[in-house]
Amino acid sequence: MRLIALPAFDDNYIWALVAADGRAIIVDPGQAAPVIATAEREGLVPSAILLTHHHGDHIDGVAELQQRWPGLELFSPADERIPTTAHHVSHGERLSLLAVDFQVIEVPGHTRTHIAFVTDRHLFSGDTLFSLGCGRMFEGTAPQMFDSLQRLACLPGETLVCCGHEYTLANAAFALHVDSTNAALQRRQQEAQAMRHAARPTLPISLKSELATNPFLRTNRPEIRAVVAARAAGALSSEVDVFAELRRWKDEFCL
């Protein structure tokens, strides 16, 4: 299977997994136009859509795509804010699409019904795990988001993270503010700057790299805990407390 990142809006990515015969699985199509343009240019035929959550920048292209390809199947979490034509999937379920096996993982936090789709090579994490960051908690709690990230962190290190937005450079600035002596993080920032200068996506990225550089996956590290505790002006009794304070810090952070 070939993986294609389709830019949408200002910083979204729609993902396409493409079989040798041109049939494709589309993940989080917030816009129809990038999918249609790619299909026309490369001879793709979308056969299924996977949705991680209900936000418009991830689902608003669905109706137009289903009109263009009437047989298109749709899989999503059970959420009244998602088109009713979807097949609802939940934690632990497995799908076999175009000879690819997908596992569904529940990852609430960004939204209350957010899910991720995992294959033997790829993690489609939506707005839960980002390159060098994580999503804002619009509907969930810090313990929920922390648990969701820990669930994803247990996947094999070679898994490629395919998230919903190109946030790497902005996230790198915050990550280095927190973890300034991390040499791997410094290298990632330099690599990402070169990629973006060349108009290339910084994604996908290996989970192994995220575990070494993403502060939201490193809340057990003494250097992270110390910096976050200093900002909080007091002891933080658990990793969840560290995560919650780190997420608050990121929400307020500006260069």
UniProtKB/Swiss-Prot annotation:
Keywords: Hydrolase, Metal-binding, Zinc. Belongs to the metallo-beta-lactamase superfamily. Glyoxalase II family. Thiolesterase that catalyzes the hydrolysis of S-D-lactoyl-glutathione to form glutathione and D-lactic acid. It comes from the Bacteria. Zn(2+) 2 binds at residues 57-58, 127, 165. Coiled coil: none annotated. Its cofactor is Zn(2+). It is an enzyme of class 3 (hydrolase). Monomer. HAMAP family: Glyoxalase_2. It catalyses: an S-(2-hydroxyacyl)glutathione + H2O = a 2-hydroxy carboxylate + glutathione + H(+). Gene3D superfamilies: Ribonuclease Z/Hydroxyacylglutathione hydrolase-like (3.60.15.10). The gene is gloB. Zn(2+) 1 binds at residues 53, 55, 110, 127. This is Hydroxyacylglutathione hydrolase. GO terms for biological process: methylglyoxal catabolic process to D-lactate via S-lactoyl-glutathione. Its EC number is 3.1.2.6. NCBIfam families: GSH_gloB. InterPro entries: Clx_II_MBL, Glyoxalase_II_hydrolase, HAGH_C, Hydroxyacylglutathione_Hdrlase, Metallo-B-lactamas, RibonucZ/Hydroxyglut_hydro. GO terms for molecular function: hydroxyacylglutathione hydrolase activity; metal ion binding. Pathway: Secondary metabolite metabolism; methylglyoxal degradation; (R)-lactate from methylglyoxal: step 2/2. The keyword Zinc applies.
